[in-house]
Amino acid sequence: MVLYKRKPILLPDPKPLPLDLNVQVWHIEETGEWFSSYEEFLERFDFYTRHHFTCEITGTSCLTFFQALDSEETQFKYVEDRFPLKLREPVARFLHFNGIRRLDALVEKVYARFKNDFFPGEVVYLRKQKDSSTTSSNSQQSTPQPDDMVEINSVGNPGLPQYQYQRRYVIKEKVQFNATINPESREIVMPAHTKYMLIEEAASSNKSFIVDQGQIYRDRSTFTKHLIKCFFKITLQRASSKMGAPWCVKPEYLAMYGLTMEWPKDMLKYKEDEPVVARRSNSANVSSPESEKNKRQSKSSGKSNTSNDASNKKETKKKRKPTEVNDSENNSSEEDKKKGQNVTSETHSKKRKKEANEEPNTENVESVPTPANAEPQAVTITSIMDDLALPYQHPPNIFPNLTYYNEKLECISLGSTKLSRPFDSFGKLLQAYQFLNTFGSKICLSHFSLDQFITSLKCTDPYELKGEVVLVNIRTQTSKEQEIENNGLPMKNKAETTTEEDSENPSDWQRNSFIRDMIMKRNSDKVEYKIVHDDPASDDILDNINHNGSALLIEVFTALLRLFINEEGDWSCIVVENWIIDDKGVLMERKDERGEGEAKQKRNAHGYFLQDKEKIDNLKDTLKENATEVQKESDAKNETNSESDSKSDSDSEERDPKLEKCLNYRNVNWIERLTKRQFNNSYWLIILLGVLEDCRHLPMYTEFIDSFIEKIIPKDISATQLPKQLWRNFCRKLSFSDKVNALWILVDLVSHFSPDIKAAVDDSMELCGQIRSERFKVARELKTEAAVLSNLQGDLQAIQEKLNKTDENTPSADGADKKDDSESNSEPIDLIIIEKKQKLIEEQDKKVQALQSDKNFLDNCLFENDLQRLKPLGLDRYGNRYFWLDHNGVPFPQYPAGMNETPKSNNSLSYHSGRLLIQGPKASSAKFFLNVSDEQLSNWQKIRNSEGISEATREVFGISKTSSGSYNYVENGIEVELLDSNDRVNPLIELTPIQKKIMDETPSRLLLSPDQWYCIDKLEDLSRIMDWLDNWGRKEHDLLRQIRPIMERIKSSLSLRDHALSLTAFTKNEEKLLKELENNEFTENELNVDSMDVDDKNSGVKSEVDVQVDAEEKREAVIDEKLEVIADELMKLDDSSKTRNVLNRIQELEDQRDELLEQKKSIINSQRPGARILARSERKRTKISRGNKVNKQIEILTDLVNYRHFKAMEDVIAWKNVLANSIWGSSLRKNASGNKRSGVIETVDDKLKDIVGQTSRTVTPAPN
């Protein structure tokens, strides 16, 4: 039966004949359909002629209906003509409820089982024997030989090939003999065999012969694996829809072969639990593919055709649902539609079964105003279908736990209350990072993680290098009063806070959210905590690239720039010079004399070839064939182009003097610097400017390159400090997005035009093919050795069972003397055999483990050396794409020896990205899967950029989430609840795909653009995503098939990153700082000491003693200040040279110090003891203690806020380009050049030899 979308199709029932039999109709002969209108006939015929059908017997796909039908008829006739009739019933009995599930394995099993087994009635031929005198002892007469035959076989089926000098024989009888066993030694004397009685097919003689199975054979063309497989396709089907169900004979062939559908006891678990409702739904009704689009459109029609009156809408829903359910029982296509709308499933998946078995909450059910006939009848989902056609369950509450990167490249949780703008160039950052690590061995760049790459990029920002500062302010009574007077603006205590400039620069960073929230929660009426930016890094810190973390980013730029020109000065990455865009938006090469003249002028002006013309000509073959047509169109528009060219030329003239001065700094052209590999001291930026200037003619880069050059070139070019000026402008004036775009342009150019990268891809394909070959050999050897190990274990078990039986049957002591001596000596012999078997098993087990280790190692090598373009793992139901960067081309992550200890650096844990990435759908996918228009997408994007995702979702799609957790939909002023706070769907509303997506992802986290990326970086979030994906949906089924084989690798990668970054726990240093913070908490007395001073001042008139004490305290404070000034000056004089004037000044200061100390001592002695004086002294000590705690808390909290960021910077600083150091002895940014050191593995054969050398195999592959 022809298959459509992997389901057997059922032709529609024939229509009744028209009343007027003379009317002309259009007829499709193959299906028997007729049509009264040509449009209907043409639509149906067009459906049949699409290449969407599959031949069920051969499995050939992409056929038209007629081709598939013809293929099936041809194959069916082929099986009927060739496959022996007498062999069909035994084969069918063997296949019926067979335990082998895989079809290819079953074919091999049947071929091996029946190759030498024959049945009465079959036509066979005799084999030629070496010794013609040999006859069977049991024969009635001698067996005939083919050489004795002189007649040509001409009797029988004329369709079969006729063999000369051979006669055809028919098996008359078949007798099977059991094996003959020696009763004493228990050895097999004669194995089991079969005898056949043959008669000649021609009825001319009555001779019969007795032969065994080794003397006869079938015609080779009548018993082949292809015929067996075709017979399977015709005869067999799955016994049930359950996973792992066995094969069984189709109902129409059961009576023919004398079989029944009685299930074996060991297979009853695969039997259907209950009869499937609407069995016809398993077969695809022959309807045009437009019906599927109509299904999607019907779901969205609820939004476009909503009535202004809500009550009318509900009434129509009530009337429509019962009729739709009734129609679904009679029409399979209508049933499929209902499955996609409101029909719930009990056996949809494991989680659907669980929900169906749970008893509903009666309280919740009563609160929903659902009509009695509104609930449709539940049906069983038995096949994979469209994801959005599955019944909607409830929001998974997964997306708030995921993370994303904001515009400051901070990893922020989506559940954060303050959602900032995402990083728009994150996709380009991932492309550049994946390219750098995939081709790291080719461009001499060691591996680094995605976190290290992002941290190095952030280390080029002056504020990131200094971090943040936590300010602590003790609020006094006067500051509170002033705060009220200034309408809530707090005044700062000058004694215990920093300057006003720091407080005017509050931090808007969101990293390290737990510590940040902990600090802000410490705010109270008496203490104020603030987090502000520290002063930006100075020029000295920015220039010290070896110790500020930016060395990794510079090494990356340097590695890419090296690919454009080799050390001989030849261009190795050739970009076609002149491009234009045709009317269709396709980039084309521009062939005109004007472009060639400009190239010559550029070449003559600088003295260097910007591009090699001969190599450019070789690339012209790859361009479009219609370039000449574009040339004609461009000639017609020369006038308009000349005006724009003149404007661009005038703009370039304004830029050219400064740019030329940079590119020819110190009279050395940038090409010469690149040839000589002069990257050190920020010369790489001059080379970068030259490469970007050379690619400015490409229209997709022009706007950015102009902006980049304008920002990075200084206004006043220094004759000696230009590279440092460029580097400081690169750090201060360029945003993270600008730096990523500059890097991405280099990656894009190299990946498209570099022959080195293309050669690396070709070598990778060749190497992977040889690794697969080695892995196949290891797997084959592993299978053989595992079978030997299994046999040894079976022999050992049999011997042990034999010993156990002898122990059980040991006679009593009275009969022990009657036992023979031979039997008493058998036990030591068996024990010796057991010891030998155990030794053999241990040795064999080591072989198996070594081969298994080799196979795993080769699997990892295959992942590491596969440099193919990274592809998404698949799509979910809403078109979101899933990526895992560790899938190919990167080293396999390895756990360290001690996972319980916190690593000193992330370099010891070789993880790659450590997360699963989700990208929003493309515009085409959103329009196709979600039925969203271009206008809605553009409006949503504009509002999202200005007001946020939540507001854009509410204005464009009319859906918002209330404070109670319910989702409301507003259209034409009518508000309808789609989902209540208990996650129950409104049964009166048919949800559209976009509505389901908004409720699943929440309005504030909606993924509707390819620029949006979410990260899954925790194991529990990964488990939730896997549980949410539905195996019965087409797209998610394919996605799960891709994720499950690499699930363990994904989990290990996430665990490695979690352990390296301590995402879910504090490190030891953080715990130590938190403990110190607890020891420096303010006491109640320290917080209230200022209010005690105010109470004393407000208590009334001071006494003479109080006045005297205050005066003495002021004198003492003045003396303390003078003593501090003298101490500072003495320290400076001690460090200077000891001249006479300096010594005299030191003596004077020491005399002044002694005098002030005497005055202070006299003041202290003059104070008389008293309660008021003691209280003042106590308050003074309390203030000093509080001040010390304030300074300590500032230090501890500042360290806590910056700890993880500074730790990441330390990891990046510790990164070294080990690969470049091993090849040239220095990093790429330090002008690594010259001949490579010996021992560098570059060729495919050397790489394969190195890989095989790390396995236990002794045979190495020979070079080609």
UniProtKB/Swiss-Prot annotation:
Native organism taxonomy: Eukaryota, Fungi, Dikarya, Ascomycota, Saccharomycotina
One GO CC annotation: nucleus
Chain segments carrying region Disordered: 130-153, 275-374, 482-508, 627-655, 803-825
Function comment: Functions as a component of the ISW2 complex, which acts in remodeling the chromatin by catalyzing an ATP-dependent alteration in the structure of nucleosomal DNA. The ISW2 complex is involved in coordinating transcriptional repression and in inheritance of telomeric silencing. It is involved in repression of MAT a-specific genes, INO1, and early meiotic genes during mitotic growth dependent upon transcription factor UME6 and in a parallel pathway to the RPD3-SIN3 histone deacetylase complex.
The keyword Lipid metabolism is annotated on this UniProt entry: no
Name of protein: Imitation switch two complex protein 1
Organism: Saccharomyces cerevisiae (strain ATCC 204508 / S288c)
Keyword field: Chromatin regulator, Nucleus, Repressor, Transcription, Transcription regulation
Domain (WAC) ranges: 23-130
